[in-house]
């Protein structure tokens, strides 16, 4: 081999080794250069992610992501990291991650195999399950008992997928958790199938006009969304989440949002972490059991 060509190859190899490990990750490079992290949140997914007093983004997932951001800032040795919040709907959340309008989504997204074809996920921070919200005087307890009923679902949600498996139902698409609960309360739908935690919050909020019934129809690991093309950023998120779990910070944040009165709501959900989440807090890792229809 010509000596000049050998020297050129050697120089190229050395230069490649000298590149920083995050150079191929455009998301992380943008965060470092701009000093800004754009977070997507939901307007009405209490207690996980919702607009609080004055429209301020609040909730369990939002506060966890704020802690993540602080640790990412420290890890990257940034003098400051400005957080910019963008409201996103269930229908558009994956597109907003894909087009870079948001770099992290902190809400109620279920980690599934199909969705991992489009986006990547951080560690699980809550295990939800689809259940039914019905009017207070409705005696039906199971989706299989609904017959030809009108069932509200959010387009693109796992609640929609669960409901589509039940023959005979007329599915009524709604844009949000609040709209689904309102449709049931006003008689425009007979039931609303969605994440149990959001339904429990809506039942408390509506003070006896609606109720959550039946066992869970699924087991769904909820986690933050990141771009599937941002492996370095995803690794940072996962490591920061492990630290939050191991030092007890995540458990304290959970207590604030699930076991104490909700800010601006005046009631507590009184929901201690279940066995799955307790195990995740104790032994955090990136393994996830794909969501299951029961």
Identify the function of each model-found stretch.
Residues 33, 161-174, 212, 242-294:
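Ligand-binding clefts/hinges and TM-proximal coupling segments of bilobed small-molecule sensing domains
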Residues 25-105, 117:
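Extracytoplasmic small-molecule ligand-binding "clamshell" domains
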Residues 18-21:
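N-terminal signal peptide c-region/cleavage motif recognized by signal peptidases
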Residues 91-92, 106-118, 162-165, 185-219:
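A ligand-binding cleft/hinge motif common to bilobed small-molecule-binding domains
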Residues 59-71, 144, 149-150, 155-157, ...:
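Extended ligand-binding regions for polar small-molecule ligands
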Residues 38, 44-47, 57-74, 110, ...:
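Bilobed "Venus flytrap"/periplasmic-binding protein-like clamshell domains
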Residues 78-95, 138, 158, 172-182, ...:
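Short helix-initiation/N-cap motifs at beta->coil->alpha
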Residues 43, 126-134, 200-242, 260-283:
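Periplasmic-binding protein-like
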């Amino acid at each position: 081999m010509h000596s000049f060509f050998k020297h050129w190859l050697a120089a190229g190899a050395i230069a490649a080794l000298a590149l920083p490990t995050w150079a191929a990750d455009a998301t992380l490079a943008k965060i470092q250069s701009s000093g800004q992290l754009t977070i997507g949140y939901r307007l009405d997914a209490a207690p996980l992610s919702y607009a609080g007093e004055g429209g301020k983004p609040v909730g369990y997932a939002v506060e966890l992501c704020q802690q993540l951001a602080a640790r990412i800032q420290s890890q990257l040795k940034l003098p400051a990291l400005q957080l910019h919040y963008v409201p996103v709907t269930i229908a558009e959340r994956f597109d907003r991650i894909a087009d870079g309008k948001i770099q992290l989504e902190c809400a109620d997204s279920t980690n599934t195999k199909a969705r991992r074809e489009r986006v990547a996920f951080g560690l699980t921070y809550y295990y939800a399950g689809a259940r039914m919200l019905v009017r207070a005087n409705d005696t039906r307890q199971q989706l299989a008992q609904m017959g030809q009923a009108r069932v509200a679902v959010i387009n693109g949600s796992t609640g929609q997928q669960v409901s589509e498996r039940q023959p005979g139902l007329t599915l009524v698409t709604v844009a949000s958790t609040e709209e689904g609960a309102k449709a049931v309360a006003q008689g425009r739908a007979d039931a609303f199938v969605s994440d149990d935690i959001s339904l429990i919050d809506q039942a408390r909020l509506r003070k006896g006009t609606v109720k959550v019934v039946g066992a869970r129809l699924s087991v769904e690991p909820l986690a933050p969304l990141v771009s599937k093309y941002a492996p370095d950023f995803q690794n940072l998120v996962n490591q920061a989440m492990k630290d939050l779990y191991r030092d007890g910070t995540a458990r304290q944040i959970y207590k604030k949002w699930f076991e104490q009165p909700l800010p601006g709501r005046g009631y507590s959900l009184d929901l201690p972490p279940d066995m799955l989440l307790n195990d995740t807090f104790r032994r955090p890792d990136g393994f996830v059991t794909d969501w299951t229809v029961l």
